[in-house]
Each structure stands twice: as structure tokens, then as C-alpha cells.
Amino acid sequence: MTIERDAAANTAKVLSEALPYIRRYVGKTLVIKYGGNAMESEELKTGFARDIVLMKAVGINPVVVHGGGPQIGDLLKRLSIESHFVDGMRVTDAQTMDVVEMVLGGQVNKDIVNLINRHGGSAIGLTGKDAELIRAKKLTVTRQTPEMTTPEIIDIGHVGEVVGINTDLLNLLVKGDFIPVIAPIGVGANGESYNINADLVAGKVAEALKAEKLMLLTNIAGLMDKSGKVLTGLSTQQVDELIADGTIYGGMLPKIRCALEAVQGGVGSSLIIDGRVPNAILLEIFTDTGVGTLISNRKRP
């Protein structure tokens, strides 16, 4: 058999093996949080766009929520606006909020939409202000030390939390064969803008849509135990135990809580995926191996 025929046979074999997975997810909604290295490498960006288009082509409904922290930081630096963080959250005054909206809604969102469309998709770019897609309120942050009798309220500006999601809009787009691409900017009751963590927005969108999967692309191989081994499958009960014993801590804690809450809120499963791996999304959907950690509501044996 020639090399060309070998390659063709391998391609046919892969497609054939993917058939049961395609059948499983046809008509289902998958929410993907896009960020990290997958947004920076040209090769990975192209691969992501092709993966999203392929999902839609075989009848799966992807909904993309993206971040953009590094891009925001870059523009703030160029504008000589200093960045400040509290507990990992960007302090967002009115001037910074203008930059956040400009970068997320005007640059990053449209770049992703354009890339997907160039590869044959029909992506629509949105922020939370469009048809009040993401209704939000100001996030209250408190801090307390042993010396304090009452917690101190810390004002971090236009940082918000999700109050509600306009599922009518998203369902309309999905049924029209469009791919929604969402920037994590929320709108308040009086029209004010809020900067919201993209993981949290993705989780709330997945809950509201009762998605089959929430997929969070990261720069790590997955959730690891204390010895550094990747934990490929966990129940919600096991995740709670890993948080309690300190295995999950620091910067991973908010991401894992988001994944956990999504499953508890009705999402089929949440996945922490290594976005540095080419075609990571397809590997998770169409194979049993995967490239990260799956969190589901299954009972522990």
C-alpha cells in the first residue's frame, strides 16, 4: 500500500471511530471558554477555529465565551494606565472599563469571529450588552482580619457577577445555525458596564442553556493531585474533598468552583482541558482519551 493510501486509510479509520461520538452529541450544546495559550499561538488559533466549524458541521452546537486579560493588560500599559488586582480580579475604574470594552468587544471578539468565519463557520460576536445577554450586578468583595469586628468592603469598581442570561437570544442564534461568540461584559440594571471573569460567564451560560458540556481551555494538563499526576475523571463529591484537603488551591480554585457549580446547576459535565494541545476540543469530544480533567455528577463507586 502506498504512503498516500496509508494516510487515506488512517483518515477513514479515525472518521469511522468518531461516528458513535458524533451521534451522542448531535443537537447538543457545548459551551467552550476560550483563553490562555490557545488564543496566542497562530497554529492553535487556527486549530480552534477549525474545530469549532467542524463541530457545527456535524450537528453539534458550540457556544464560545472568550477571555482577553493579556490583551487588556497590553493596551493599558500602552496607554500608561496602571493595573491593580485584588484577589486575582482586575480593579476596574471607569477609564479601565472603557479599555476592557474596547479590547474584549472590539478587538478580541471580532478577531475570533473573523477567524471562525474564514474557516467556513457563521459566527456572531456579542457582548453582554446585546439584547441584555448577560445581566449583571456589582460584585461585592470583602476582607476581614482577626482584628476586625466587621468585614471591610473593598471597592474594585466595575467588576460584576452574573444575574441572568438571555437564553432566548442564544437559542435563536443556535437554531439559525450561527455560532455565538461572547465577550464577558455584563450590563447592569441602569445600563452600566461590568467586567466579569470569563470562566464564570461560561459557567452561567452553560447552566442557563442546560448544556451537555462546559469546556474550560487552560494552560495546564488538567487538575493534578499532590504528586503531580493528572486526575482524568472526578465526581462532584471528589472535587469537594480535594478542595477541603487543600489539593485544589490558589488560582485554580475559582476555575474549579465554576466547573463544579455548572455540573451542580444541570450541565452534563465540566472539563478542564489543556488548550496547548492541538485539536484539544475534538480529542475530548470524539475520543475516550481526552486531554484534561472531567467533572461529572456520577456517583462514586
Curated annotation (Swiss-Prot):
Tell me which residues bind substrate.
G68, G69, R90, N195
Q: State any single GO MF term.
A: acetylglutamate kinase activity
Q: Which reaction does it catalyse?
A: N-acetyl-L-glutamate + ATP = N-acetyl-L-glutamyl 5-phosphate + ADP
Domain of life the protein comes from = Bacteria
Gene Ontology CC terms: cytoplasm
Q: Where is this site: Transition state stabilizer?
A: K33, K255
Main localization (coarse): cytoplasm
Top enzyme class, one word, equals transferase
Q: Biological process GO terms, please?
A: arginine biosynthetic process via ornithine; L-arginine biosynthetic process
User: Where does the protein end up?
Assistant: Cytoplasm
Pathway annotation from the record: Amino-acid biosynthesis; L-arginine biosynthesis; N(2)-acetyl-L-ornithine from L-glutamate: step 2/4
Question: Which CDD domains does the record associate with it?
Answer: AAK_NAGK-C
Question: Which positions form S-S bridges?
Answer: none
The keyword Ribonucleoprotein belongs to this UniProt entry's keyword annotation: no
Q: What is its EC number?
A: 2.7.2.8
Q: Which UniProt keywords apply?
A: Amino-acid biosynthesis, Arginine biosynthesis, ATP-binding, Cytoplasm, Kinase, Nucleotide-binding, Transferase
Q: Does the keyword Transferase apply?
A: yes
Against PANTHER family, the record matches this protein to: N-ACETYLGLUTAMATE SYNTHASE, N-ACETYLGLUTAMATE SYNTHASE, MITOCHONDRIAL
* Family of this protein: Belongs to the acetylglutamate kinase family. ArgB subfamily.
List, alphabetically, the NCBIfam families matched: argB (TIGR00761)
- Role description: Catalyzes the ATP-dependent phosphorylation of N-acetyl-L-glutamate.
Write down what this protein is called: Acetylglutamate kinase
Organism expressing this protein natively: Pseudomonas fluorescens (strain ATCC BAA-477 / NRRL B-23932 / Pf-5)
